[in-house]
Design a protein with these regions (language model features):
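Catalytic toxin/effector domains delivered as secreted proteins or via bacterial secretion systems
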Residues: 1-78
Length: 78
């Protein structure tokens, strides 16, 4: 499945409009899968990291570039 780059998680269309991130509910770590990391760097060269954000109605998982752009946004309801 190809990954697309968006300006933010809401622009992806995967996150519901009422979703609000919880304070202190963010985990960021390096992309561990070498194939995915290589693919992301082909899309946009630079530093990428995996982000998991907890929110009021579920969690959002995505890859974030150093510029703030995101890819591979997935929403998991509670």
């Amino acid at each position: 499945m190809p990954l697309y780059i968006y300006t933010d998680v809401y622009a992806s269309g995967s996150v519901p409009r009422g979703w609000v991130p919880t304070r202190g509910g963010t985990v960021k770590y390096p992309v561990r899968n070498p194939a995915v990391h290589r693919y992301l760097r082909q899309l946009l060269p630079g530093r990428w990291q995996k982000v998991i954000k907890q929110g009021n109605s579920g969690a959002v998982h995505y890859f974030e570039h150093a510029s703030g752009q995101v890819a591979g946004v997935k929403y998991y309801p509670n």
